[in-house]
Amino acid sequence: MNKKITYFLTVLLLGTVLFSEVFAGGAKRNGTAGAQELLIPSSASGLALNGSNISSITGLDAVFYNPAGFGGTQTSTEAMFSNLTYIADISMSYAAVGVNFSELGSLAFSLRTLNFGDIPVTTVDNPYGTGSTYSPSFVTLGLTYANSLTDRIRVGINLKLVSEKIVRTSATGFAFDAGIQYQGLAGLDGLNFGITLKNLGPQMKFDGPDLIRSASEAEAKRGTNFYTIDAASFELPSSLELGLSYAYNLANDYKMVVSSAFQNNNFSNDEYKLGYEFVYDDMLFLRGGYAYMGEAKDNEYQQFFGVTAGVGVKVNIGFEMVVDYAYRAAKFSESNHLIGVKFNF
């Protein structure tokens, strides 16, 4: 068993080094990746810490940030629902359910949808609108598996089916996340380490009847000709993250968790994240976080979001219910608000 664990860790670390080389220079490719909905957070507790807690996050909250943390689920069944008010009147709805099969690991299913509202239809002949509306359909389905290899090591993988549709033009692809968490680093209880690779997958491409166009030449003897616009393929917003956290007791019922993470983005500036969580009696949670983009310091338009904060409350009503709220400041739009509810059975 120890040999298998050593082999797994070696492969993961080598893969991490390889991907870090591949991701180098991500800032030079700002704005060139698609499927940006994969970057929208679904966990209020994680967002409140600005995603800095990839080494310690557990349960269904971990599905988005580090699937290995889902292997730390302590209950037999867990359900989660959240809603985010994003930017430009866009909102995100998320639902997930997970089952713990003990030594066999944990399995979760998730669904994420975006709501764009009704958008007026405009054409070349009617640039101010035709009177009709449309609403894009962006849906992501997820299947997550995680397990604890030992009392210290957790691993997990998250498979995602990504679907984007705008009227009769659509693109479909898949991506996966993989992660690991190591508890008690260097034999120190409370010191945790995490690695996660996110949104790895093949390129996506739009296609559909709405890309078919007609053309005719004034002096052509033939009738109208039809051709299809060949849309360019686009890559997914992949990233590599390394995280470290430390939890320590302040008093009998009080605990403080300090977490940090480095995020190496393939298509944007790298980020340095820091978060603090104050816990009272495993019942009340106060959180705050910040992300810093060093390469974006000379360009205010590259760091869109600012500080984060949030609160969580856990109550027992025959089963555990957790209500979390997160706030994220934004520079050029309204601030984000994410509310999540979890049920543990």
Predicted regions and their residues:
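Bacterial N-terminal signal peptides that target proteins for export
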Residues: 1-9
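Short intrinsically disordered, low-complexity coil segments enriched in acidic
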Residues: 2, 19-20
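A general marker of short, structured functional hotspots
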Residues: 3-4, 15, 141
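Bacterial N-terminal signal peptides
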Residues: 10-17
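Subset of outer-membrane beta-barrel
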Residues: 21-345
